[in-house]
Protein backbone atom coordinates (compact mmCIF):
# COMPACT_ATOMS: atom_id res chain seq x y z
CA UNK A 1 0.00 0.00 0.00
CA UNK A 2 2.78 2.40 0.96
CA UNK A 3 4.70 1.70 -2.26
CA UNK A 4 1.55 2.28 -4.31
CA UNK A 5 1.04 5.71 -2.72
CA UNK A 6 4.69 6.60 -3.38
CA UNK A 7 4.28 5.47 -7.00
CA UNK A 8 1.20 7.64 -7.48
CA UNK A 9 2.92 10.66 -5.91
CA UNK A 10 5.98 10.17 -8.12
CA UNK A 11 3.80 9.86 -11.22
CA UNK A 12 1.89 13.03 -10.27
CA UNK A 13 5.14 14.98 -9.81
CA UNK A 14 6.48 13.81 -13.16
CA UNK A 15 3.20 14.66 -14.90
CA UNK A 16 3.21 18.13 -13.35
CA UNK A 17 6.79 18.69 -14.49
CA UNK A 18 5.95 17.60 -18.03
CA UNK A 19 2.92 19.88 -18.19
CA UNK A 20 4.90 22.84 -16.89
CA UNK A 21 7.83 22.22 -19.21
CA UNK A 22 8.30 24.82 -21.91
CA UNK A 23 8.79 23.36 -25.36
CA UNK A 24 10.89 25.58 -27.58
CA UNK A 25 9.95 25.94 -31.25
CA UNK A 26 11.87 23.78 -33.68
CA UNK A 27 14.18 25.76 -35.95
CA UNK A 28 16.06 24.69 -39.08
CA UNK A 29 19.26 26.34 -37.95
CA UNK A 30 20.68 28.13 -34.94
CA UNK A 31 18.99 27.98 -31.57
CA UNK A 32 16.41 29.77 -29.45
CA UNK A 33 17.01 31.04 -25.94
CA UNK A 34 13.77 31.80 -24.12
CA UNK A 35 13.19 34.29 -21.34
CA UNK A 36 10.01 33.05 -19.74
CA UNK A 37 7.56 35.63 -18.42
CA UNK A 38 9.89 38.60 -18.76
CA UNK A 39 8.74 40.91 -15.99
CA UNK A 40 8.16 44.58 -16.70
CA UNK A 41 7.14 47.72 -14.86
CA UNK A 42 5.22 48.82 -17.92
CA UNK A 43 3.34 45.89 -19.47
CA UNK A 44 2.11 42.40 -18.63
CA UNK A 45 4.84 39.78 -18.39
CA UNK A 46 5.45 37.71 -21.51
CA UNK A 47 7.92 35.32 -23.10
CA UNK A 48 10.79 36.60 -25.21
CA UNK A 49 12.50 34.25 -27.68
CA UNK A 50 16.02 35.12 -28.82
CA UNK A 51 17.10 33.36 -32.00
CA UNK A 52 20.86 32.99 -32.43
CA UNK A 53 22.21 32.00 -35.85
CA UNK A 54 24.30 28.89 -36.41
CA UNK A 55 27.84 29.52 -35.21
CA UNK A 56 26.89 32.41 -32.93
CA UNK A 57 30.06 33.59 -31.19
CA UNK A 58 30.92 36.11 -28.52
CA UNK A 59 33.85 37.17 -30.70
CA UNK A 60 31.50 38.51 -33.39
CA UNK A 61 29.18 41.49 -33.14
CA UNK A 62 25.59 41.10 -34.37
CA UNK A 63 22.85 43.49 -35.38
CA UNK A 64 19.51 43.07 -33.58
CA UNK A 65 16.00 42.75 -35.03
CA UNK A 66 13.15 43.13 -32.54
CA UNK A 67 9.97 41.43 -33.77
CA UNK A 68 6.44 41.47 -32.39
CA UNK A 69 4.01 38.52 -32.12
CA UNK A 70 7.00 36.41 -31.17
CA UNK A 71 5.03 33.18 -30.81
CA UNK A 72 4.24 33.27 -34.55
CA UNK A 73 7.80 33.42 -35.88
CA UNK A 74 8.84 29.75 -35.85
CA UNK A 75 7.47 26.21 -35.97
CA UNK A 76 3.90 26.04 -37.27
CA UNK A 77 3.20 23.06 -35.03
CA UNK A 78 3.16 25.47 -32.07
CA UNK A 79 1.16 28.39 -33.52
CA UNK A 80 -2.59 28.82 -33.12
CA UNK A 81 -3.29 28.73 -36.87
CA UNK A 82 -0.49 26.33 -37.84
CA UNK A 83 1.16 29.11 -39.86
CA UNK A 84 4.49 30.78 -39.21
CA UNK A 85 6.86 33.39 -40.61
CA UNK A 86 9.67 30.76 -40.66
CA UNK A 87 12.05 33.58 -39.82
CA UNK A 88 14.87 31.18 -39.01
CA UNK A 89 14.66 29.58 -42.44
CA UNK A 90 14.55 32.89 -44.32
CA UNK A 91 17.41 34.47 -42.35
CA UNK A 92 19.56 31.35 -42.57
CA UNK A 93 19.13 31.22 -46.34
CA UNK A 94 20.09 34.89 -46.71
CA UNK A 95 23.12 34.46 -44.45
CA UNK A 96 24.33 31.45 -46.44
CA UNK A 97 24.03 33.50 -49.64
CA UNK A 98 25.96 36.33 -47.97
CA UNK A 99 23.12 38.76 -48.71
CA UNK A 100 22.72 40.18 -45.20
CA UNK A 101 24.91 41.02 -42.24
CA UNK A 102 24.97 38.92 -39.06
CA UNK A 103 21.98 39.41 -36.81
CA UNK A 104 19.99 37.95 -33.96
CA UNK A 105 16.20 38.00 -33.65
CA UNK A 106 14.44 39.08 -30.45
CA UNK A 107 10.87 37.80 -30.70
CA UNK A 108 8.54 39.46 -28.20
CA UNK A 109 5.41 37.42 -27.56
CA UNK A 110 2.12 39.24 -27.56
CA UNK A 111 -0.36 39.09 -24.71
CA UNK A 112 -3.60 38.02 -26.37
CA UNK A 113 -5.65 40.08 -23.93
CA UNK A 114 -3.73 43.33 -24.46
CA UNK A 115 -2.29 42.98 -27.96
CA UNK A 116 -4.43 45.68 -29.56
CA UNK A 117 -3.76 48.13 -26.73
CA UNK A 118 -0.04 47.37 -26.76
CA UNK A 119 0.36 47.88 -30.51
CA UNK A 120 -2.04 50.78 -31.19
CA UNK A 121 -0.06 54.08 -31.54
CA UNK A 122 -1.13 56.22 -28.60
CA UNK A 123 -0.27 59.73 -29.74
CA UNK A 124 -2.41 59.70 -32.90
CA UNK A 125 -5.28 58.26 -30.87
CA UNK A 126 -4.98 61.01 -28.27
CA UNK A 127 -5.37 63.64 -31.01
CA UNK A 128 -8.88 62.39 -31.77
CA UNK A 129 -11.93 64.19 -30.47
CA UNK A 130 -13.74 62.39 -27.68
CA UNK A 131 -16.59 61.37 -29.97
CA UNK A 132 -14.02 59.87 -32.36
CA UNK A 133 -12.33 57.98 -29.54
CA UNK A 134 -15.73 56.62 -28.58
CA UNK A 135 -16.22 55.48 -32.17
CA UNK A 136 -12.92 53.61 -32.13
CA UNK A 137 -13.79 52.02 -28.78
CA UNK A 138 -17.18 50.91 -30.07
CA UNK A 139 -15.69 49.41 -33.23
CA UNK A 140 -13.07 47.49 -31.26
CA UNK A 141 -15.62 46.30 -28.72
CA UNK A 142 -17.79 44.92 -31.52
CA UNK A 143 -14.73 43.18 -32.93
CA UNK A 144 -13.96 41.61 -29.54
CA UNK A 145 -10.63 43.41 -29.16
CA UNK A 146 -11.56 45.17 -25.93
CA UNK A 147 -14.28 44.84 -23.31
CA UNK A 148 -13.72 48.27 -21.82
CA UNK A 149 -13.24 51.80 -23.08
CA UNK A 150 -10.22 51.56 -25.35
CA UNK A 151 -6.95 53.12 -24.19
CA UNK A 152 -3.73 52.43 -26.12
CA UNK A 153 -0.78 51.19 -24.07
CA UNK A 154 1.79 51.46 -26.84
CA UNK A 155 3.89 54.10 -25.10
CA UNK A 156 4.38 51.71 -22.20
CA UNK A 157 5.08 48.84 -24.60
CA UNK A 158 7.86 50.87 -26.21
CA UNK A 159 9.22 51.83 -22.79
CA UNK A 160 9.43 48.11 -22.03
CA UNK A 161 11.50 47.55 -25.17
CA UNK A 162 13.74 50.60 -24.77
CA UNK A 163 14.25 50.68 -21.01
CA UNK A 164 14.05 47.02 -20.03
CA UNK A 165 14.44 44.56 -22.90
CA UNK A 166 17.10 46.30 -25.00
CA UNK A 167 19.46 46.83 -22.04
CA UNK A 168 19.09 43.14 -21.21
CA UNK A 169 19.89 42.09 -24.78
CA UNK A 170 22.78 44.56 -25.03
CA UNK A 171 24.36 43.18 -21.85
CA UNK A 172 23.64 39.49 -22.42
CA UNK A 173 24.57 39.07 -26.08
CA UNK A 174 27.42 40.10 -28.37
CA UNK A 175 25.51 42.77 -30.27
CA UNK A 176 25.99 46.24 -31.65
CA UNK A 177 24.02 48.67 -29.51
CA UNK A 178 23.88 51.65 -31.85
CA UNK A 179 21.03 52.90 -34.03
CA UNK A 180 22.55 51.67 -37.28
CA UNK A 181 22.32 48.07 -36.07
CA UNK A 182 19.01 48.14 -34.19
CA UNK A 183 15.83 47.35 -36.13
CA UNK A 184 12.19 46.58 -35.45
CA UNK A 185 9.60 44.66 -37.47
CA UNK A 186 6.08 43.31 -37.42
CA UNK A 187 2.91 42.75 -39.39
CA UNK A 188 -0.61 44.13 -39.15
CA UNK A 189 -0.84 45.84 -35.74
CA UNK A 190 2.81 44.83 -35.38
CA UNK A 191 3.50 46.95 -38.44
CA UNK A 192 1.84 49.93 -36.81
CA UNK A 193 3.83 49.65 -33.59
CA UNK A 194 7.07 49.20 -35.55
CA UNK A 195 6.44 52.44 -37.43
CA UNK A 196 5.45 54.18 -34.20
CA UNK A 197 8.68 52.95 -32.59
CA UNK A 198 10.99 54.41 -35.23
CA UNK A 199 9.06 57.69 -35.19
CA UNK A 200 9.12 58.00 -31.39
CA UNK A 201 12.67 56.71 -30.92
CA UNK A 202 14.68 57.69 -34.00
CA UNK A 203 17.90 57.66 -31.98
CA UNK A 204 17.33 53.99 -31.05
CA UNK A 205 16.03 52.37 -34.25
CA UNK A 206 17.73 52.67 -37.61
CA UNK A 207 15.08 50.81 -39.57
CA UNK A 208 11.57 49.39 -39.43
CA UNK A 209 9.78 46.74 -41.48
CA UNK A 210 6.01 47.17 -41.51
CA UNK A 211 4.27 44.33 -43.35
CA UNK A 212 0.53 44.60 -44.04
CA UNK A 213 0.41 47.67 -41.82
CA UNK A 214 -3.02 47.84 -40.18
CA UNK A 215 -3.75 51.44 -41.14
CA UNK A 216 -7.42 51.21 -40.21
CA UNK A 217 -6.74 50.46 -36.53
CA UNK A 218 -10.12 48.76 -36.17
CA UNK A 219 -11.74 46.45 -38.72
CA UNK A 220 -13.92 48.73 -40.85
CA UNK A 221 -13.21 51.78 -42.99
CA UNK A 222 -16.63 53.41 -42.70
CA UNK A 223 -16.87 56.18 -40.11
CA UNK A 224 -13.31 55.46 -39.02
CA UNK A 225 -11.30 58.58 -38.08
CA UNK A 226 -7.98 56.94 -37.24
CA UNK A 227 -6.40 56.47 -40.71
CA UNK A 228 -6.36 60.22 -41.30
CA UNK A 229 -4.90 60.78 -37.84
CA UNK A 230 -2.13 58.29 -38.60
CA UNK A 231 -1.37 60.24 -41.78
CA UNK A 232 -1.20 63.52 -39.86
CA UNK A 233 1.12 61.93 -37.31
CA UNK A 234 3.49 60.68 -40.03
CA UNK A 235 3.53 64.07 -41.68
CA UNK A 236 5.05 65.57 -38.53
CA UNK A 237 6.95 62.67 -36.97
CA UNK A 238 8.73 60.62 -39.61
CA UNK A 239 12.45 60.25 -38.84
CA UNK A 240 15.18 61.57 -41.11
CA UNK A 241 15.64 59.66 -44.38
CA UNK A 242 19.37 60.31 -44.03
CA UNK A 243 19.70 57.92 -41.10
CA UNK A 244 16.69 55.59 -41.30
CA UNK A 245 15.17 52.92 -43.52
CA UNK A 246 11.46 52.10 -43.61
CA UNK A 247 9.77 49.21 -45.42
CA UNK A 248 6.02 48.92 -46.07
CA UNK A 249 3.97 46.41 -48.00
CA UNK A 250 0.47 45.01 -48.44
CA UNK A 251 -1.53 42.50 -50.43
CA UNK A 252 -5.07 43.01 -51.68
CA UNK A 253 -6.96 40.02 -50.30
CA UNK A 254 -8.84 39.49 -47.00
CA UNK A 255 -7.91 42.18 -44.45
CA UNK A 256 -5.14 43.47 -46.71
CA UNK A 257 -7.76 44.65 -49.20
CA UNK A 258 -8.43 47.60 -46.87
CA UNK A 259 -4.84 48.89 -46.99
CA UNK A 260 -3.70 49.87 -50.53
CA UNK A 261 -5.52 53.19 -50.83
CA UNK A 262 -4.23 54.36 -47.45
CA UNK A 263 -0.76 53.03 -48.21
CA UNK A 264 -0.65 55.17 -51.36
CA UNK A 265 -1.30 58.26 -49.23
CA UNK A 266 1.52 57.18 -46.92
CA UNK A 267 3.77 56.80 -49.95
CA UNK A 268 3.05 60.40 -50.93
CA UNK A 269 4.09 61.57 -47.47
CA UNK A 270 7.29 59.53 -47.69
CA UNK A 271 8.21 61.23 -50.98
CA UNK A 272 7.40 64.65 -49.56
CA UNK A 273 9.66 63.98 -46.57
CA UNK A 274 12.62 63.10 -48.75
CA UNK A 275 12.60 59.30 -48.66
CA UNK A 276 13.91 57.59 -51.80
CA UNK A 277 14.92 54.12 -52.97
CA UNK A 278 17.85 54.09 -50.57
CA UNK A 279 15.74 54.75 -47.49
CA UNK A 280 12.27 53.44 -48.28
CA UNK A 281 10.43 50.63 -50.04
CA UNK A 282 6.70 50.05 -50.42
CA UNK A 283 5.80 46.71 -51.95
CA UNK A 284 2.38 45.88 -53.37
CA UNK A 285 1.58 42.18 -53.73
CA UNK A 286 -1.62 41.49 -55.72
CA UNK A 287 -3.30 38.24 -54.77
CA UNK A 288 -1.69 38.01 -51.34
CA UNK A 289 -3.73 37.90 -48.14
CA UNK A 290 -3.29 38.75 -44.47
CA UNK A 291 -1.41 35.76 -43.10
CA UNK A 292 1.91 34.47 -41.83
CA UNK A 293 2.25 32.38 -45.00
CA UNK A 294 2.00 35.53 -47.11
CA UNK A 295 4.50 37.42 -44.96
CA UNK A 296 6.93 34.51 -45.08
CA UNK A 297 6.96 34.58 -48.88
CA UNK A 298 8.23 38.17 -48.99
CA UNK A 299 10.15 38.47 -45.72
CA UNK A 300 13.45 38.27 -47.59
CA UNK A 301 12.75 41.67 -49.19
CA UNK A 302 12.72 43.80 -46.01
CA UNK A 303 15.54 41.74 -44.50
CA UNK A 304 17.78 42.37 -47.49
CA UNK A 305 16.80 46.04 -47.47
CA UNK A 306 17.51 46.59 -43.78
CA UNK A 307 20.52 44.31 -43.34
CA UNK A 308 22.18 44.64 -46.74
CA UNK A 309 25.95 44.30 -46.52
Protein language model features and the residues they cover:
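Bacterial Sec-dependent N-terminal signal peptides
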Residues: 1-25
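Non-catalytic cap/lid and distal C-terminal segments of serine-dependent acyl enzymes
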Residues: 21-309
Amino acid sequence: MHSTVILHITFFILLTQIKSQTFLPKVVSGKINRIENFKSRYITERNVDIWLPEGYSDTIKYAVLYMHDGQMLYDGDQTWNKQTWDVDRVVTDLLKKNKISNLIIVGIWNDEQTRHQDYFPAKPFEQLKQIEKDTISAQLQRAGRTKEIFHPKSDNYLKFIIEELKPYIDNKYSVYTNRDNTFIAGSSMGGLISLYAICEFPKIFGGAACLSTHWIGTFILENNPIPNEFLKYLNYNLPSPNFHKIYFDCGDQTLDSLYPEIQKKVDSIMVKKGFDNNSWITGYFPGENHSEEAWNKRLNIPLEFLFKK
